[in-house]
Design a protein with these regions (language model features):
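A solvent-exposed, acidic/Ser-Thr-rich amphipathic alpha-helical stretch
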Residues: 13-74
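Eukaryotic short linear interaction motifs
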Residues: 17-19, 26-27, 75-79, 103-105, ...
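Generic preference for well-ordered alpha-helical elements
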Residues: 5, 33-36, 89, 108, ...
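Exposed beta-sheet edge and beta->alpha loop/turn motif
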Residues: 67-105
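Eukaryotic intrinsically disordered and solvent-exposed regulatory patches
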Residues: 3-5, 53-55, 78-84
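Short, cysteine-centered beta-strand-loop-beta hairpins and adjacent loop/turn segments enriched
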Residues: 45-49, 73-88, 117-126
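Short acidic-aromatic low-complexity motifs
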Residues: 1-15
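Terminal "cap-and-tail" regions of soluble proteins that handle hydrophobic small molecules
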Residues: 97-161
Length: 161
C-alpha cells in the first residue's frame, strides 16, 4: 500500500482522474489521494500477484498522451474464486493523459483503461461467456457483409474510389 501511494504521489497529479469499464474517479482537487489510490488498493486486496506486461508503448508528444498495449494476469486471493471463476489474462490498452508542469516533468492527469467487450464479459460472467460475445460479434459482422453485398447488387451502394 505504501509503494502504491508513493508511486501515485510521484507520477500522478493531485487532481488525476481514473476511468475503467467497471468504475471511475472523476477529477477533483484531491481525487488522486481520495479516489484513485483507493481503487488501486481495493484491486490489490482483491487480486494477488497481478502481473502486467507492456507489449508496446507510444508517446504522442503533440497531445501529451501515452498509449500502452498490455496484458494483465489477475488471480484472486479468494481460493473458490481463483479455482472456479477468476484466474485469467486480459488484454487492454491504457491511455495516460499527461500534463507538463513548471519543473519540466510530465505527470498523469488521467488514466483510462480500455478492455474489449469480450474481456469485460469474461470478468462479469466467467466460464466461456467471452466466446459467446465473440461469436455474436462475428455473426453481426457476417450480417453486415451480406447487407452491403445485397445493396451493392441492387446498385444502392457503390464502392467509392
Amino acid at each position: 500500500a505504501d509503494k502504491q501511494r508513493d508511486v501515485l504521489q510521484r507520477y500522478y497529479l493531485p487532481s488525476a482522474s481514473f476511468d475503467h469499464p467497471m468504475c471511475s474517479v472523476t477529477r477533483s482537487r484531491h481525487s488522486r489521494d481520495a479516489g484513485v489510490l483507493q481503487i488501486y488498493q481495493f484491486l490489490r486486496i482483491l487480486f494477488m500477484d497481478t502481473e502486467i506486461k507492456i507489449h508496446s508503448s507510444c508517446f504522442d508528444e503533440e497531445n501529451n498522451r501515452v498509449y500502452l498495449e498490455a496484458t494483465q494476469h489477475l488471480r484472486s486471493y479468494i481460493p473458490f474464486v481463483r479455482k472456479y471463476l477468476y484466474d485469467r489474462t486480459a488484454r487492454l490498452v491504457v491511455l495516460l493523459d499527461l500534463r507538463k508542469l513548471d519543473d519540466g516533468k510530465y505527470y498523469v492527469s488521467r488514466q483510462q483503461d480500455l478492455y474489449s467487450i469480450q474481456e469485460e464479459a469474461e470478468t462479469i460472467l466467467p466460464g466461456g461467456f467471452d466466446t459467446v460475445i465473440v461469436n455474436i460479434k462475428a455473426f453481426v459482422g457476417h450480417l453486415i457483409m451480406l447487407q452491403v453485398a445485397f445493396f451493392q447488387l441492387l446498385g444502392i451502394w457503390t464502392v467509392r474510389n
